[in-house]
Each structure stands twice: as structure tokens, then as C-alpha cells.
Swiss-Prot record:
Residues 115-150, 166-218 are annotated as: Disordered. NCBIfam families: PRK07772.1 (NF005851), ssb (TIGR00621). This is Single-stranded DNA-binding protein. GO terms for molecular function: single-stranded DNA binding. It comes from the Bacteria. Homotetramer.
Length: 218
């Protein structure tokens, strides 16, 4: 939620988690994490422990069950959560206020130890469900890539070939368009076509080269 203080703490459990069930049937695990800072002493050339911070933590529902099954006294953990302040009435009747950390995540620190994670039944079900959904997503994808994609590509080739052939036919029609089949072809060397050429049909006579008309033509 907005406005909440989220922190991360690294430390050791001071005792085993205490698991209890509240009136609504929800399980809650409570324990304390001791976070001790270490500083370097230049005089002794050694690390020294500073003042420890004891943070009271609470985990709810499935996280509470997992903490009770996994965490033990002295284990070094990394926890993240939200700081919350609550008030309660002590056994002596006094009213007290404490600041607690409501955990969102917690796990073992691997800096000085190793750990092996074992999934619970609820976690396995959710993981397998995600795997099944992933496989289900692969099948439509494969069908689209192999069948739908190839079909579309073949259709594209057909359209390309059809367009290319159609374009070739159109190009042939444009080439034949200037020819008029009803009009005869004009022969520029014939007398019929000499109306616009004048004496072009008599070109080559002796008079054209300065000779007499009685001279034989070439």
C-alpha cells in the first residue's frame, strides 16, 4: 500500500518461529531477527560487533507455515517487509506499543551457508499450471508459424505471380494500341503516299542530278 515503510533486514533468528492460529482460522508465525552490524576496528585490525537490532517479525498464511517448517534458531535470513505499529494491553494491564515487520518475503542467506529449496504441493501445482499454459501457448504459435505463415507466403507468391503476369499482358496491350486494324499501312515509297511528299516519289531521276530528261534513269 502507498505510504508504508518497506525495509530489508539481514540477521539471525533468536528462536524458533512460533506458529499459532487466530480466530478466523488464519495461521501466523512470529519470531525475532537480530541484525548485528560489524565494523572494522583500525586499532585492533579486527571486525567488531556493533549494537544489535532486534526486529519482531510476523508472517501470515502460507508464508507462516513455510517459516515454521523451514526456519530454526540461529539461521541467518534475509527478510523484506513493511513496518507496522500496533498497540496491545499487557498482562499487567498496561498499554504498550510495538513496531513490527510484516513479512512479504524471507529466505536463507547463502553467504555463510548453502540451502536446498523444496517446493510444496501448492507451489508445484502453480508451477505446473504455468508450464502447461506455456506449452499451450507454443502450439498455436507453431501452427501459425508453420502453417499459417507458409500459407500466407504462398498466397503472397501467387499474388505476385498473378500481378506480374497481368502486368505483362497489360504491357502487350499498350504496345499494340497505336495500331489501327481498319486502316491500311502507309508506304512512304509508294505514289499513294506522295500527296504530302510532293515529288518525293520521283526522287532519283536524271534531272535531279543535273542531267537531261533523255538520259536513262538509274
Amino acid at each position: 500500500m502507498a505510504g508504508e515503510t518497506v525495509i530489508t533486514i539481514v540477521g539471525n533468528l533468536t528462536a524458533d518461529p512460533e506458529l499459532r492460529t487466530i480466530g478466523s482460522g488464519v495461521t501466523v508465525a512470529s519470531f525475532t531477527i537480530a541484525s548485528t552490524p560489524r565494523t572494522w576496528n583500525r586499532q585492533t585490525n579486527q571486525f567488531e560487533d556493533g549494537q544489535a537490532l532486534f526486529m519482531r517479525c510476523s508472517a501470515w498464511r502460507d508464508l507462516a507455515d513455510h517459516c515454521a517448517q523451514s526456519l530454526k534458531k540461529g539461521m541467518r535470513v534475509i527478510a523484506t517487509g513493511r513496518l507496522q505499529q500496533r498497540s496491545y494491553q499487557a498482562q499487567d494491564g498496561s498499554q504498550r506499543t510495538v513496531v513490527e515487520m510484516q513479512l512479504d518475503e524471507i529466505g536463507p542467506s547463502l553467504r555463510y551457508a548453502t540451502a536446498q529449496v523444496t517446493r510444496q504441493s501448492s507451489g508445484q501445482g502453480g508451477f505446473q499450471g504455468r508450464s502447461g499454459g506455456f506449452q499451450g501457448g507454443q502450439q498455436p504459435n507453431q501452427g501459425y508459424g508453420n502453417q499459417g505463415g507458409q500459407g500466407g507466403y504462398a498466397g503472397g507468391q501467387g499474388g505476385y505471380n498473378g500481378g506480374y503476369q497481368g502486368g505483362g499482358a497489360g504491357y502487350s496491350q499498350q504496345s499494340a494500341a497505336p495500331a489501327n486494324p481498319s486502316a491500311p499501312a502507309v508506304d512512304p515509297w509508294s505514289n499513294a503516299g506522295a500527296s504530302d511528299a510532293g515529288s518525293f516519289s520521283t526522287f532519283g531521276a536524271s534531272s535531279d542530278f543535273g542531267g537531261d530528261d533523255s538520259d536513262p534513269e538509274f
